[in-house]
Protein backbone atom coordinates (compact mmCIF):
# COMPACT_ATOMS: atom_id res chain seq x y z
CA UNK A 1 0.00 0.00 0.00
CA UNK A 2 1.42 3.35 -0.98
CA UNK A 3 0.78 6.29 1.33
CA UNK A 4 0.12 9.53 -0.46
CA UNK A 5 2.85 12.18 0.10
CA UNK A 6 1.72 15.20 2.03
CA UNK A 7 1.91 18.48 0.28
CA UNK A 8 4.61 20.76 1.75
CA UNK A 9 2.97 23.74 3.52
CA UNK A 10 3.66 27.02 1.82
CA UNK A 11 1.01 29.32 3.36
CA UNK A 12 -0.15 30.03 6.91
CA UNK A 13 -3.45 28.25 6.28
CA UNK A 14 -1.55 25.13 5.19
CA UNK A 15 -0.28 24.67 8.80
CA UNK A 16 -2.46 22.58 11.06
CA UNK A 17 -1.21 24.42 14.15
CA UNK A 18 0.40 27.70 15.04
CA UNK A 19 3.17 27.63 17.64
CA UNK A 20 3.14 30.71 19.84
CA UNK A 21 6.58 31.46 21.41
CA UNK A 22 5.00 32.58 24.69
CA UNK A 23 1.59 32.57 26.26
CA UNK A 24 1.35 36.36 26.06
CA UNK A 25 3.01 36.72 22.65
CA UNK A 26 5.61 39.21 23.88
CA UNK A 27 8.71 37.18 23.03
CA UNK A 28 11.00 38.04 20.16
CA UNK A 29 14.02 36.68 18.33
CA UNK A 30 17.19 38.79 18.29
CA UNK A 31 19.99 37.11 16.38
CA UNK A 32 23.20 38.58 14.95
CA UNK A 33 25.77 36.92 12.74
CA UNK A 34 29.00 38.84 13.31
CA UNK A 35 30.59 37.43 10.18
CA UNK A 36 27.70 38.36 7.89
CA UNK A 37 29.05 41.79 6.71
CA UNK A 38 32.43 40.34 5.80
CA UNK A 39 30.83 37.34 4.09
CA UNK A 40 28.50 39.62 2.16
CA UNK A 41 31.46 41.71 1.00
CA UNK A 42 33.33 38.54 0.12
CA UNK A 43 30.40 37.36 -2.01
CA UNK A 44 30.20 40.75 -3.73
CA UNK A 45 33.92 40.59 -4.45
CA UNK A 46 33.49 37.14 -6.00
CA UNK A 47 30.65 38.47 -8.14
CA UNK A 48 32.93 41.32 -9.25
CA UNK A 49 35.76 38.99 -10.21
CA UNK A 50 33.28 36.86 -12.20
CA UNK A 51 31.79 40.05 -13.71
CA UNK A 52 28.34 39.10 -12.44
CA UNK A 53 25.63 41.68 -11.60
CA UNK A 54 28.11 44.50 -12.29
CA UNK A 55 26.23 47.64 -13.27
CA UNK A 56 29.13 49.99 -13.99
CA UNK A 57 32.31 50.09 -16.03
CA UNK A 58 34.97 52.53 -14.84
CA UNK A 59 37.21 53.75 -17.68
CA UNK A 60 40.40 54.93 -15.95
CA UNK A 61 42.61 57.06 -18.20
CA UNK A 62 46.19 57.89 -17.33
CA UNK A 63 48.54 59.43 -19.88
CA UNK A 64 47.96 57.29 -23.01
CA UNK A 65 46.60 54.27 -21.19
CA UNK A 66 42.97 53.26 -20.51
CA UNK A 67 42.07 50.49 -18.06
CA UNK A 68 38.51 49.26 -17.47
CA UNK A 69 37.08 48.04 -14.16
CA UNK A 70 33.68 46.35 -13.88
CA UNK A 71 32.15 47.14 -10.49
CA UNK A 72 28.92 47.51 -8.55
CA UNK A 73 27.68 51.07 -8.00
CA UNK A 74 26.29 50.12 -4.60
CA UNK A 75 29.69 49.04 -3.26
CA UNK A 76 31.45 52.19 -4.50
CA UNK A 77 28.68 54.43 -3.15
CA UNK A 78 28.85 52.71 0.24
CA UNK A 79 32.63 53.22 0.42
CA UNK A 80 33.02 56.73 -0.95
CA UNK A 81 30.93 59.91 -0.42
CA UNK A 82 32.26 61.04 -3.80
CA UNK A 83 30.73 58.09 -5.63
CA UNK A 84 27.61 58.18 -3.46
CA UNK A 85 26.94 61.74 -4.59
CA UNK A 86 27.72 60.80 -8.20
CA UNK A 87 25.20 57.95 -8.26
CA UNK A 88 22.40 59.41 -6.10
CA UNK A 89 22.25 63.14 -6.82
CA UNK A 90 20.75 63.28 -10.31
CA UNK A 91 24.09 63.70 -12.03
CA UNK A 92 24.27 62.23 -15.49
CA UNK A 93 26.35 59.36 -14.07
CA UNK A 94 23.39 58.34 -11.89
CA UNK A 95 21.88 56.22 -14.67
CA UNK A 96 25.03 55.69 -16.70
CA UNK A 97 26.54 52.28 -17.12
CA UNK A 98 29.98 53.72 -17.91
CA UNK A 99 31.99 56.44 -16.14
CA UNK A 100 35.42 57.81 -17.04
CA UNK A 101 37.98 58.78 -14.37
CA UNK A 102 40.73 60.92 -15.85
CA UNK A 103 44.34 61.55 -14.85
CA UNK A 104 44.50 58.94 -12.13
CA UNK A 105 46.77 55.91 -11.97
CA UNK A 106 44.90 52.64 -12.76
CA UNK A 107 47.00 50.70 -10.23
CA UNK A 108 45.92 53.10 -7.49
CA UNK A 109 42.24 52.87 -8.48
CA UNK A 110 42.60 49.08 -8.45
CA UNK A 111 43.86 49.25 -4.84
CA UNK A 112 40.97 51.48 -3.80
CA UNK A 113 38.40 49.23 -5.47
CA UNK A 114 39.93 46.25 -3.69
CA UNK A 115 39.57 48.14 -0.40
CA UNK A 116 35.91 48.92 -1.11
CA UNK A 117 35.19 45.20 -1.51
CA UNK A 118 37.57 43.76 1.12
CA UNK A 119 38.16 46.55 3.69
CA UNK A 120 41.88 45.87 3.31
CA UNK A 121 44.65 47.67 1.45
CA UNK A 122 48.36 46.93 1.10
CA UNK A 123 50.58 49.64 -0.35
CA UNK A 124 54.34 49.81 -0.82
CA UNK A 125 56.04 52.90 0.56
CA UNK A 126 56.83 54.14 -2.94
CA UNK A 127 53.10 54.31 -3.75
CA UNK A 128 51.74 55.72 -0.49
CA UNK A 129 51.70 59.35 -1.65
CA UNK A 130 49.83 58.39 -4.84
CA UNK A 131 47.26 56.39 -2.89
CA UNK A 132 46.84 59.21 -0.35
CA UNK A 133 46.24 61.78 -3.08
CA UNK A 134 43.66 59.60 -4.85
CA UNK A 135 41.94 58.56 -1.60
CA UNK A 136 41.48 62.20 -0.69
CA UNK A 137 40.19 62.97 -4.18
CA UNK A 138 37.50 60.30 -3.87
CA UNK A 139 36.88 60.98 -0.16
CA UNK A 140 37.88 57.54 1.09
CA UNK A 141 38.80 58.80 4.54
CA UNK A 142 39.84 55.48 6.09
CA UNK A 143 42.43 54.89 3.38
CA UNK A 144 43.67 58.47 3.57
CA UNK A 145 44.06 58.20 7.33
CA UNK A 146 45.93 54.91 7.02
CA UNK A 147 48.33 56.51 4.53
CA UNK A 148 48.83 59.53 6.80
CA UNK A 149 49.49 57.31 9.81
CA UNK A 150 52.05 55.33 7.80
CA UNK A 151 53.82 58.50 6.67
CA UNK A 152 53.82 59.96 10.19
CA UNK A 153 55.47 56.82 11.55
CA UNK A 154 58.12 56.91 8.85
CA UNK A 155 59.13 60.57 8.94
CA UNK A 156 62.87 61.10 8.66
CA UNK A 157 65.08 64.18 8.31
CA UNK A 158 65.65 63.21 4.67
CA UNK A 159 61.96 63.05 3.65
CA UNK A 160 60.00 65.28 6.01
CA UNK A 161 60.23 68.50 3.99
CA UNK A 162 58.94 66.81 0.82
CA UNK A 163 56.09 65.15 2.70
CA UNK A 164 55.25 68.43 4.42
CA UNK A 165 55.01 70.31 1.15
CA UNK A 166 52.92 67.53 -0.40
CA UNK A 167 50.53 67.50 2.58
CA UNK A 168 50.12 71.26 2.38
CA UNK A 169 49.40 71.16 -1.36
CA UNK A 170 46.67 68.51 -1.08
CA UNK A 171 45.13 70.03 2.05
CA UNK A 172 45.97 67.18 4.43
CA UNK A 173 45.99 69.27 7.60
CA UNK A 174 46.86 66.64 10.21
CA UNK A 175 49.82 65.32 8.23
CA UNK A 176 51.05 68.82 7.50
CA UNK A 177 50.93 69.79 11.18
CA UNK A 178 52.77 66.64 12.19
CA UNK A 179 55.53 67.23 9.64
CA UNK A 180 55.97 70.81 10.85
CA UNK A 181 56.27 69.54 14.42
CA UNK A 182 58.88 67.03 13.26
CA UNK A 183 60.86 69.72 11.41
CA UNK A 184 60.75 72.01 14.45
CA UNK A 185 61.90 69.21 16.74
CA UNK A 186 64.65 67.88 14.45
CA UNK A 187 65.64 71.18 12.86
CA UNK A 188 69.39 70.67 13.11
CA UNK A 189 69.21 67.23 11.44
CA UNK A 190 66.75 68.36 8.75
CA UNK A 191 69.02 71.22 7.68
CA UNK A 192 71.75 68.73 6.75
CA UNK A 193 69.57 66.95 4.17
CA UNK A 194 69.27 67.75 0.46
CA UNK A 195 65.54 68.54 0.68
CA UNK A 196 66.34 71.50 2.94
CA UNK A 197 68.30 73.20 0.18
CA UNK A 198 65.32 72.98 -2.18
CA UNK A 199 63.33 75.38 0.00
CA UNK A 200 62.59 78.78 -1.46
CA UNK A 201 63.74 81.80 0.51
CA UNK A 202 60.12 82.45 1.52
CA UNK A 203 59.72 78.90 2.83
CA UNK A 204 62.99 79.12 4.76
CA UNK A 205 62.04 82.51 6.17
CA UNK A 206 58.71 81.13 7.36
CA UNK A 207 60.46 78.17 8.97
CA UNK A 208 63.10 80.09 10.94
CA UNK A 209 60.61 82.76 12.02
CA UNK A 210 58.87 80.26 14.29
CA UNK A 211 59.66 80.44 17.98
CA UNK A 212 58.59 76.78 18.20
CA UNK A 213 61.91 75.64 16.67
CA UNK A 214 63.75 73.33 19.05
CA UNK A 215 67.43 74.26 18.89
CA UNK A 216 70.05 74.09 21.59
CA UNK A 217 71.58 77.35 20.46
CA UNK A 218 70.57 80.08 18.02
CA UNK A 219 73.84 79.46 16.19
CA UNK A 220 72.14 76.38 14.66
CA UNK A 221 69.58 78.65 12.96
CA UNK A 222 72.30 81.02 11.77
CA UNK A 223 74.39 78.14 10.36
CA UNK A 224 71.36 76.77 8.52
CA UNK A 225 70.89 80.12 6.78
CA UNK A 226 74.57 80.30 5.86
CA UNK A 227 74.51 76.76 4.44
CA UNK A 228 71.33 77.48 2.45
CA UNK A 229 72.86 80.60 0.89
CA UNK A 230 76.15 78.82 0.17
CA UNK A 231 74.24 76.09 -1.74
CA UNK A 232 73.66 78.60 -4.54
CA UNK A 233 75.47 81.74 -3.43
CA UNK A 234 75.12 83.58 -6.72
CA UNK A 235 71.32 83.65 -6.68
CA UNK A 236 70.67 83.39 -2.94
CA UNK A 237 73.03 86.01 -1.51
CA UNK A 238 70.37 88.67 -2.09
CA UNK A 239 68.13 87.02 0.54
CA UNK A 240 70.74 86.77 3.29
CA UNK A 241 69.85 90.02 5.05
CA UNK A 242 66.16 89.11 5.18
CA UNK A 243 67.07 85.75 6.70
CA UNK A 244 69.32 87.40 9.30
CA UNK A 245 66.39 89.53 10.43
CA UNK A 246 64.56 86.32 11.36
CA UNK A 247 67.52 84.95 13.33
CA UNK A 248 67.61 85.88 17.03
CA UNK A 249 70.96 87.61 16.61
CA UNK A 250 71.14 88.85 20.20
CA UNK A 251 70.89 85.23 21.37
CA UNK A 252 74.07 84.26 19.49
CA UNK A 253 77.11 83.70 21.72
CA UNK A 254 79.51 86.66 21.34
CA UNK A 255 82.45 84.33 20.68
CA UNK A 256 80.53 82.65 17.86
CA UNK A 257 79.53 85.98 16.35
CA UNK A 258 83.13 87.19 16.50
CA UNK A 259 84.36 84.12 14.58
CA UNK A 260 81.69 84.62 11.93
CA UNK A 261 82.73 88.23 11.41
CA UNK A 262 86.35 87.16 11.08
CA UNK A 263 86.07 84.13 8.80
CA UNK A 264 82.61 83.62 7.24
CA UNK A 265 83.03 83.79 3.41
CA UNK A 266 79.36 84.70 2.88
CA UNK A 267 79.65 87.69 5.22
CA UNK A 268 82.84 88.89 3.55
CA UNK A 269 80.85 89.46 0.35
CA UNK A 270 77.76 90.96 2.02
CA UNK A 271 78.81 94.33 3.42
CA UNK A 272 75.39 95.36 4.72
CA UNK A 273 75.03 92.07 6.59
CA UNK A 274 78.52 92.33 8.02
CA UNK A 275 77.90 95.89 9.20
CA UNK A 276 74.62 94.79 10.78
CA UNK A 277 76.29 91.98 12.74
CA UNK A 278 79.33 94.11 13.63
CA UNK A 279 77.09 96.69 15.27
CA UNK A 280 75.41 94.03 17.41
CA UNK A 281 78.74 92.45 18.34
CA UNK A 282 80.12 95.77 19.53
CA UNK A 283 77.02 96.27 21.68
CA UNK A 284 77.72 92.87 23.25
CA UNK A 285 81.42 93.62 23.72
CA UNK A 286 80.66 96.94 25.44
CA UNK A 287 78.18 95.17 27.76
CA UNK A 288 75.37 97.47 26.69
CA UNK A 289 71.84 96.47 27.75
CA UNK A 290 70.51 94.22 24.99
CA UNK A 291 66.89 93.89 23.86
CA UNK A 292 65.05 90.85 25.25
CA UNK A 293 65.26 87.83 22.98
CA UNK A 294 62.36 85.36 22.76
CA UNK A 295 63.27 81.75 23.45
CA UNK A 296 62.90 79.06 20.81
CA UNK A 297 60.50 76.37 21.99
CA UNK A 298 59.07 75.81 25.45
CA UNK A 299 61.39 76.36 28.39
CA UNK A 300 61.31 74.23 31.55
CA UNK A 301 62.90 74.48 35.00
CA UNK A 302 65.30 71.56 35.51
CA UNK A 303 66.12 70.17 38.96
CA UNK A 304 69.19 67.91 39.20
CA UNK A 305 70.17 65.80 42.19
CA UNK A 306 69.78 67.08 45.76
CA UNK A 307 69.69 65.61 49.22
CA UNK A 308 67.02 63.91 51.36
CA UNK A 309 68.48 61.40 53.84
CA UNK A 310 70.98 60.66 51.06
CA UNK A 311 72.18 62.20 47.81
CA UNK A 312 69.79 61.80 44.86
CA UNK A 313 70.47 60.94 41.22
CA UNK A 314 67.17 62.21 39.82
CA UNK A 315 66.65 64.74 37.05
CA UNK A 316 63.22 66.34 36.86
CA UNK A 317 61.75 69.23 34.92
CA UNK A 318 58.88 71.52 35.87
CA UNK A 319 56.56 73.22 33.38
CA UNK A 320 55.06 76.24 35.20
CA UNK A 321 52.43 76.77 32.49
CA UNK A 322 51.01 73.26 32.75
CA UNK A 323 51.98 72.68 36.40
CA UNK A 324 53.48 69.35 35.34
CA UNK A 325 56.60 67.55 36.55
CA UNK A 326 58.59 65.31 34.21
CA UNK A 327 60.99 62.60 35.31
CA UNK A 328 63.97 62.43 32.96
CA UNK A 329 67.19 60.47 32.55
CA UNK A 330 68.92 59.85 35.88
CA UNK A 331 72.32 61.38 36.58
CA UNK A 332 75.42 59.23 36.29
CA UNK A 333 75.73 59.10 40.09
CA UNK A 334 73.88 60.53 43.10
CA UNK A 335 74.90 64.10 43.87
CA UNK A 336 73.99 66.94 46.24
CA UNK A 337 75.58 70.32 46.87
CA UNK A 338 76.16 70.62 43.13
CA UNK A 339 75.96 73.64 40.86
CA UNK A 340 73.96 73.76 37.62
CA UNK A 341 73.93 76.05 34.61
CA UNK A 342 72.94 76.13 30.95
CA UNK A 343 75.38 76.77 28.12
CA UNK A 344 74.28 76.68 24.47
CA UNK A 345 71.07 74.90 25.48
CA UNK A 346 72.86 72.07 27.33
CA UNK A 347 72.43 71.52 31.07
CA UNK A 348 75.70 71.21 33.00
CA UNK A 349 76.11 69.95 36.57
CA UNK A 350 79.30 70.79 38.44
CA UNK A 351 80.89 69.34 41.58
CA UNK A 352 78.88 68.40 44.69
CA UNK A 353 79.19 65.21 46.70
CA UNK A 354 77.71 61.73 47.02
CA UNK A 355 76.53 61.41 50.61
CA UNK A 356 74.85 58.29 52.00
CA UNK A 357 75.22 55.90 54.93
CA UNK A 358 77.88 54.02 52.96
CA UNK A 359 79.57 56.91 51.19
CA UNK A 360 80.69 60.53 51.59
CA UNK A 361 82.74 61.58 48.60
CA UNK A 362 83.22 65.10 47.29
CA UNK A 363 82.93 65.32 43.53
CA UNK A 364 84.93 67.14 40.92
CA UNK A 365 82.80 65.86 38.06
CA UNK A 366 81.32 67.84 35.19
CA UNK A 367 78.32 66.24 33.50
CA UNK A 368 76.28 67.46 30.55
CA UNK A 369 72.62 66.66 29.85
CA UNK A 370 71.26 67.06 26.30
CA UNK A 371 67.47 67.67 26.26
CA UNK A 372 67.37 66.67 22.59
CA UNK A 373 68.44 63.11 23.44
CA UNK A 374 67.72 62.74 27.18
CA UNK A 375 71.32 61.55 27.58
CA UNK A 376 74.12 62.46 29.99
CA UNK A 377 77.78 62.84 29.00
CA UNK A 378 80.76 62.92 31.35
CA UNK A 379 83.25 65.72 30.63
CA UNK A 380 86.60 66.86 32.01
CA UNK A 381 86.60 66.97 35.84
CA UNK A 382 87.46 70.01 37.93
CA UNK A 383 91.05 70.39 39.09
CA UNK A 384 89.79 70.02 42.66
CA UNK A 385 86.57 68.56 44.07
CA UNK A 386 84.02 71.18 45.15
CA UNK A 387 81.00 70.53 47.36
CA UNK A 388 78.37 73.28 47.69
CA UNK A 389 80.01 75.03 44.75
CA UNK A 390 78.70 78.17 43.05
CA UNK A 391 78.36 78.21 39.26
CA UNK A 392 77.97 80.96 36.65
CA UNK A 393 78.35 81.45 32.88
CA UNK A 394 80.10 84.34 31.12
CA UNK A 395 80.90 84.59 27.40
CA UNK A 396 80.57 80.88 26.69
CA UNK A 397 82.62 79.71 29.70
CA UNK A 398 81.52 78.04 32.94
CA UNK A 399 82.93 79.28 36.25
CA UNK A 400 83.08 77.06 39.36
CA UNK A 401 83.44 79.19 42.48
CA UNK A 402 84.54 78.19 45.98
CA UNK A 403 83.04 75.14 47.70
CA UNK A 404 84.86 72.67 49.90
CA UNK A 405 86.86 69.44 49.82
CA UNK A 406 86.96 67.58 53.13
CA UNK A 407 87.90 70.23 55.73
CA UNK A 408 89.32 72.66 53.15
CA UNK A 409 87.15 75.60 52.10
CA UNK A 410 88.11 77.07 48.74
CA UNK A 411 88.66 80.64 47.66
CA UNK A 412 89.85 79.34 44.28
CA UNK A 413 87.87 79.64 41.05
CA UNK A 414 88.07 77.54 37.88
CA UNK A 415 86.91 78.30 34.33
CA UNK A 416 85.76 75.66 31.84
CA UNK A 417 86.17 76.07 28.07
CA UNK A 418 83.68 73.79 26.23
CA UNK A 419 85.72 73.97 23.01
CA UNK A 420 88.85 72.49 24.59
CA UNK A 421 87.08 70.55 27.38
CA UNK A 422 89.55 71.93 29.93
CA UNK A 423 89.38 73.60 33.34
CA UNK A 424 91.89 76.32 34.24
CA UNK A 425 92.30 78.34 37.43
CA UNK A 426 91.59 82.06 37.37
CA UNK A 427 92.24 84.67 40.06
CA UNK A 428 91.03 83.55 43.51
CA UNK A 429 88.51 85.39 45.68
CA UNK A 430 89.66 87.35 48.72
CA UNK A 431 88.10 84.78 51.10
CA UNK A 432 86.96 81.18 50.98
CA UNK A 433 83.24 80.72 50.33
CA UNK A 434 81.10 77.59 50.62
CA UNK A 435 77.38 77.82 49.86
CA UNK A 436 77.73 81.25 48.26
CA UNK A 437 75.26 82.65 45.77
CA UNK A 438 76.70 83.15 42.28
CA UNK A 439 75.22 84.99 39.29
CA UNK A 440 76.50 86.56 36.07
CA UNK A 441 75.32 90.04 35.18
CA UNK A 442 76.63 92.57 32.68
CA UNK A 443 79.61 90.40 31.76
CA UNK A 444 80.76 90.12 35.38
CA UNK A 445 80.50 87.33 37.94
CA UNK A 446 79.05 88.21 41.34
CA UNK A 447 79.71 86.03 44.39
CA UNK A 448 77.47 86.77 47.35
CA UNK A 449 77.71 85.63 50.98
CA UNK A 450 78.85 82.12 51.88
CA UNK A 451 80.77 80.40 54.68
CA UNK A 452 84.52 79.87 55.14
CA UNK A 453 84.34 77.27 57.94
CA UNK A 454 84.42 79.92 60.67
CA UNK A 455 82.58 82.96 59.36
CA UNK A 456 79.39 83.55 57.41
CA UNK A 457 79.61 86.48 55.05
CA UNK A 458 77.46 89.34 53.91
CA UNK A 459 80.26 90.51 51.62
CA UNK A 460 80.03 90.55 47.82
CA UNK A 461 82.85 90.22 45.28
CA UNK A 462 82.71 90.95 41.56
CA UNK A 463 84.97 89.24 39.02
CA UNK A 464 86.02 90.98 35.78
CA UNK A 465 87.00 88.30 33.23
CA UNK A 466 88.67 90.85 30.93
CA UNK A 467 91.21 91.80 33.61
CA UNK A 468 91.05 88.60 35.70
CA UNK A 469 90.52 90.65 38.85
CA UNK A 470 88.14 90.74 41.81
CA UNK A 471 86.77 93.77 43.60
CA UNK A 472 84.43 94.23 46.54
CA UNK A 473 81.07 95.93 46.09
CA UNK A 474 78.46 96.91 48.68
CA UNK A 475 77.77 94.15 51.22
CA UNK A 476 74.32 92.71 51.88
CA UNK A 477 72.28 93.89 54.84
CA UNK A 478 72.15 90.31 56.20
CA UNK A 479 74.74 87.59 56.66
CA UNK A 480 73.77 84.62 54.45
CA UNK A 481 75.13 81.25 53.39
CA UNK A 482 73.18 78.60 51.50
CA UNK A 483 71.33 81.41 49.74
CA UNK A 484 70.07 81.66 46.18
CA UNK A 485 71.18 84.50 43.89
CA UNK A 486 69.87 85.45 40.45
CA UNK A 487 70.26 88.39 38.10
CA UNK A 488 67.19 90.00 36.53
CA UNK A 489 66.82 93.41 34.84
CA UNK A 490 70.25 94.59 36.04
CA UNK A 491 69.47 93.73 39.66
CA UNK A 492 70.87 90.96 41.86
CA UNK A 493 68.37 89.20 44.12
CA UNK A 494 69.66 87.39 47.23
CA UNK A 495 66.99 84.98 48.48
CA UNK A 496 66.79 83.13 51.81
CA UNK A 497 69.79 81.32 53.27
CA UNK A 498 71.15 80.69 56.76
CA UNK A 499 72.56 83.35 59.10
CA UNK A 500 74.22 81.01 61.60
CA UNK A 501 71.17 80.74 63.83
CA UNK A 502 68.14 80.17 61.63
CA UNK A 503 66.99 79.76 58.05
CA UNK A 504 65.80 82.98 56.41
CA UNK A 505 62.79 83.90 54.30
CA UNK A 506 63.93 87.46 53.63
CA UNK A 507 65.12 88.74 50.25
CA UNK A 508 67.19 91.76 49.34
CA UNK A 509 68.03 93.31 45.99
CA UNK A 510 71.28 94.86 44.78
CA UNK A 511 71.11 97.84 42.44
CA UNK A 512 74.21 97.44 40.30
CA UNK A 513 74.12 101.01 39.03
CA UNK A 514 73.79 102.59 42.50
CA UNK A 515 75.81 99.95 44.40
CA UNK A 516 73.21 99.57 47.15
CA UNK A 517 71.15 96.74 48.65
CA UNK A 518 67.49 97.18 49.57
CA UNK A 519 65.03 94.81 51.30
CA UNK A 520 62.25 93.29 49.20
CA UNK A 521 59.24 91.08 49.95
CA UNK A 522 59.92 87.95 52.00
CA UNK A 523 59.09 84.40 50.91
CA UNK A 524 56.27 82.45 52.52
CA UNK A 525 58.73 79.92 53.99
CA UNK A 526 62.18 80.15 55.52
CA UNK A 527 64.67 78.08 53.55
CA UNK A 528 68.36 77.51 52.82
CA UNK A 529 70.19 75.24 50.34
CA UNK A 530 67.27 75.76 47.96
CA UNK A 531 67.20 76.07 44.19
CA UNK A 532 66.51 79.39 42.50
CA UNK A 533 66.13 80.42 38.87
CA UNK A 534 64.58 83.07 36.64
CA UNK A 535 61.74 81.89 34.43
CA UNK A 536 59.97 84.36 32.13
CA UNK A 537 60.84 87.42 34.21
CA UNK A 538 59.84 85.82 37.52
CA UNK A 539 61.95 84.22 40.25
CA UNK A 540 61.18 80.62 41.16
CA UNK A 541 62.45 79.14 44.43
CA UNK A 542 62.30 75.38 44.94
CA UNK A 543 62.74 73.14 47.96
CA UNK A 544 65.48 73.67 50.51
CA UNK A 545 65.69 72.99 54.23
CA UNK A 546 64.50 74.62 57.45
CA UNK A 547 63.78 73.61 61.04
CA UNK A 548 60.70 71.74 59.84
CA UNK A 549 62.76 69.49 57.56
CA UNK A 550 63.18 69.17 53.80
CA UNK A 551 60.87 71.41 51.79
CA UNK A 552 58.93 70.46 48.68
CA UNK A 553 57.22 73.82 48.18
CA UNK A 554 57.79 76.00 45.12
CA UNK A 555 57.35 79.78 45.33
CA UNK A 556 57.26 82.41 42.58
CA UNK A 557 58.20 86.09 42.91
CA UNK A 558 56.79 88.78 40.63
CA UNK A 559 59.02 91.90 40.65
CA UNK A 560 56.23 94.08 39.24
CA UNK A 561 54.02 93.48 42.29
CA UNK A 562 56.79 92.58 44.79
CA UNK A 563 54.75 89.55 45.88
CA UNK A 564 55.67 85.90 46.51
CA UNK A 565 53.11 83.22 45.59
CA UNK A 566 53.08 79.53 46.50
CA UNK A 567 52.89 77.67 43.18
CA UNK A 568 53.07 73.92 43.73
CA UNK A 569 55.11 71.18 45.39
CA UNK A 570 57.96 69.10 44.05
CA UNK A 571 57.32 65.35 43.85
CA UNK A 572 59.92 64.89 46.63
CA UNK A 573 61.22 67.49 49.08
CA UNK A 574 64.97 68.03 49.01
CA UNK A 575 67.82 70.50 49.45
CA UNK A 576 71.17 71.08 47.75
CA UNK A 577 70.00 70.49 44.17
CA UNK A 578 71.12 72.18 40.96
CA UNK A 579 68.50 74.28 39.16
CA UNK A 580 68.57 75.87 35.69
CA UNK A 581 66.25 76.69 32.78
CA UNK A 582 66.51 75.39 29.22
CA UNK A 583 64.40 73.93 26.41
CA UNK A 584 61.95 71.10 27.01
CA UNK A 585 63.01 67.58 26.01
CA UNK A 586 61.98 66.40 22.55
CA UNK A 587 58.52 64.74 22.39
CA UNK A 588 59.95 61.38 21.40
CA UNK A 589 61.77 61.06 24.73
CA UNK A 590 59.18 62.60 27.03
CA UNK A 591 57.81 60.14 29.58
CA UNK A 592 54.17 60.11 30.55
CA UNK A 593 53.13 62.76 33.03
CA UNK A 594 53.48 61.53 36.57
CA UNK A 595 51.22 62.41 39.45
CA UNK A 596 52.74 64.48 42.20
CA UNK A 597 53.36 62.59 45.44
CA UNK A 598 53.39 64.02 48.92
CA UNK A 599 56.74 64.58 50.57
CA UNK A 600 57.54 62.30 53.46
CA UNK A 601 57.92 64.44 56.56
Curated annotation (Swiss-Prot):
Ranges of the Kelch repeats in the UniProt entry: 292-337, 338-388, 389-435, 436-482, 484-529, 530-576
Instruction: Provide the BACK domain boundaries.
Output: 153-253
Q: In chain numbering, where does the site feature Sensor for electrophilic agents fall?
A: 127, 264
Q: How does it assemble?
A: Homodimer and heterodimer; heterodimerizes with keap1b. Component of the BCR(KEAP1) E3 ubiquitin ligase complex, at least composed of 2 molecules of cul3, 2 molecules of keap1 (keap1a and/or keap1b), and rbx1. Interacts with nfe2l2/nrf2; the interaction is direct.
User: Can you name this protein?
Assistant: Kelch-like ECH-associated protein 1A
In the UniProt annotation, what is the result of changing residue 264 to S?
A: Abolishes repression of nfe2l2/nrf2-dependent gene expression
Instruction: Give the metabolic or biological pathway.
Output: Protein modification; protein ubiquitination
Organism this protein belongs to: Danio rerio (Zebrafish)
Summarize the PTM comment: Non-enzymatic covalent modifications of reactive cysteines by electrophile metabolites inactivate the BCR(KEAP1) complex.
Query: What does this gene product do?
Result: Substrate-specific adapter of a BCR (BTB-CUL3-RBX1) E3 ubiquitin ligase complex that regulates the response to oxidative stress by targeting nfe2l2/nrf2 for ubiquitination. Keap1 acts as a key sensor of oxidative and electrophilic stress: in normal conditions, the BCR(KEAP1) complex mediates ubiquitination and degradation of nfe2l2/nrf2, a transcription factor regulating expression of many cytoprotective genes.
Q: Which GO terms describe its biological process?
A: cellular response to oxidative stress; cellular response to prostaglandin stimulus; cellular response to xenobiotic stimulus; larval feeding behavior; proteasome-mediated ubiquitin-dependent protein catabolic process; protein ubiquitination; regulation of autophagy; ubiquitin-dependent protein catabolic process
* A single MF term (Gene Ontology): ubiquitin-like ligase-substrate adaptor activity
Tissue expression notes: Widely expressed.
Q: Where in the cell is it found?
A: Cytoplasm; Nucleus
Per the record, GO CC terms? Cul3-RING ubiquitin ligase complex; cytoplasm; inclusion body; nucleus
| Key words, A-Z | Cytoplasm, Kelch repeat, Nucleus, Repeat, Ubl conjugation pathway
Task: Please name the InterPro entries in this protein's record.
Answer: BACK, BTB-kelch_protein, BTB/POZ_dom, KEAP1_BACK, KEAP1_BTB_POZ_dom, Kelch-typ_b-propeller, Kelch_1, SKP1/BTB/POZ_sf
Amino acid sequence: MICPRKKRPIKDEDFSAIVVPSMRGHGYLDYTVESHPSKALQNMDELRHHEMLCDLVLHVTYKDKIVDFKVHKLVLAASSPYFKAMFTSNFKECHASEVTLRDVCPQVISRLIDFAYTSRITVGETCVLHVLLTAMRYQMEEVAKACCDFLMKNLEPSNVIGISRFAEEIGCTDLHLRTREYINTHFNEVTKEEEFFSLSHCQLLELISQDSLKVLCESEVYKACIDWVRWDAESRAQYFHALLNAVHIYALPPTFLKRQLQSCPILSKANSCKDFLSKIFHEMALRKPLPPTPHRGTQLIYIAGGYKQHSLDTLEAFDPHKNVWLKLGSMMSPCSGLGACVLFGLLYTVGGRNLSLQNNTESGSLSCYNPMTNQWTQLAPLNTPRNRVGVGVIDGSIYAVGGSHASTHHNSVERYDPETNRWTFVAPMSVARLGAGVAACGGCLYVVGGFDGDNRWNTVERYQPDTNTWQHVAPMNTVRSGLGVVCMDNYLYAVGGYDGQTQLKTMERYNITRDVWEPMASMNHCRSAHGVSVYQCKIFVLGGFNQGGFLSSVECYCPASNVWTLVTDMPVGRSGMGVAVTMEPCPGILPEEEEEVDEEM
